[in-house]
């Protein structure tokens, strides 16, 4: 497969603050790439560099196997993007807003606007004023604008941010359909891991400006294991009891005191009985399987991604 995006040792520094630190990622043709991290991790800064909105402090970007800086105009013609909240004229309809954008982009294709509105499911809402759109409809209109010029690469920055579960489901389905039916390569940033893991082929996890891991999602799933999750009153005593009574050493203790026990899954009741007999308060005990959320927590060494 051809590499659509190649980023090598990319850094963006503002004074003494390093927003993105020596980042390297690769996105192959046809992939949906999940660029994941907490708010403020460096996702949007990276995307702005990819789109030429800000200049890197150092590093190299290749898109469509061409150096970005020296081929910027040509490359950007084949990229569609939605960065943060899409901006439109509130007192114009969806169709009127897209007509203005089509003129700016120099799009001559007669039915381009109708086509993208149909793709994003807004054909029946094209004469509704933008100010009367729901947040989910506004996000879909932003994606429609990004598709107007039939790009090869689509970059979406937090497209499900602030949406209700129905809106998230609609955007997720739309992204899947775009990748499959139009063979578009998609880079999507998010902090909502449960939604992203249903979409992506490859994952890049960024934290405090540093890429912690880049992995194919299928390989990540193979790493997932079942574990017993226990919340208790005395972590040190529990660790001692697990080691001396059951020979359990394959466990982790999270910052919030939760135990993750990766062995002896079938002995959950015996473990619970041992703890209670030793005056340990057991607030919660359940068997869970690792997913992208728990994988992220383990990588960054603490709380959830929000």
Residue ranges and their predicted role:
Residues 1-11, 302-306:
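ABC-family P-loop ATPase nucleotide-binding domain
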Residues 76, 98, 114-117, 169, ...:
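Generic structural signal for individual residues within well-ordered alpha-helical segments
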Residues 226-299, 306:
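Short, charged/small-residue-rich alpha-helical element at the C-terminal edge
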Residues 172-262:
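ABC transporter nucleotide-binding domain
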Residues 29, 106, 124, 234, ...:
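Non-catalytic surface loops within mature trypsin-like serine protease
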Residues 5, 12-188, 193-207, 211-213:
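ABC transporter nucleotide-binding domains
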């Amino acid at each position: 497969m051809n590499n659509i995006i190649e980023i090598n040792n990319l850094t963006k520094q503002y004074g003494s603050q390093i927003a993105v630190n020596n980042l390297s990622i690769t996105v192959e043709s046809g992939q949906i790439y999940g660029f994941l991290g907490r708010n403020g991790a460096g996702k949007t800064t990276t995307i702005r560099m990819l789109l030429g909105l800000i200049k890197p402090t150092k590093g190299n970007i290749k898109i469509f196997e061409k150096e970005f800086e020296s081929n910027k105009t040509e490359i950007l013609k084949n990229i569609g993007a939605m960065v943060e909240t899409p901006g439109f004229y509130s007192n114009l309809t969806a169709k009127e807003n897209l007509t203005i954008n089509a003129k700016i982009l120099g799009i001559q294709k007669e039915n381009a606007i109708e086509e993208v509105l149909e793709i994003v499911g807004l054909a029946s809402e094209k004469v509704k004023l933008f100010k009367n759109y729901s947040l989910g409809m506004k996000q879909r209109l932003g994606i429609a604008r990004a598709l107007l010029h039939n790009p090869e690469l689509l970059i979406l920055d937090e497209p499900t941010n602030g949406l209700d579960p129905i809106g998230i489901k609609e955007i997720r389905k739309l992204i899947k359909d775009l990748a499959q039916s139009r063979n578009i390569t998609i880079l999507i940033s998010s902090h909502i891991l449960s939604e992203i893991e249903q979409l992506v082929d490859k994952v890049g996890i960024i934290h405090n400006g540093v890429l912690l891991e880049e992995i194919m999602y299928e390989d990540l799933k193979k790493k997932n294991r079942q574990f017993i999750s226990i919340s208790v009153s005395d972590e040190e005593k529990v660790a001692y009891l697990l080691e001396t009574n059951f020979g359990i050493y394959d466990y982790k203790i999270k910052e919030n005191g939760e135990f993750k026990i990766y062995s002896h899954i079938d002995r959950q009741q015996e473990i619970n009985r041992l703890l209670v007999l030793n005056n340990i308060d057991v607030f919660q005990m359940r068997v869970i399987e690792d997913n992208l959320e728990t994988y992220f927590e383990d990588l960054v060494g603490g709380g959830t991604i929000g």
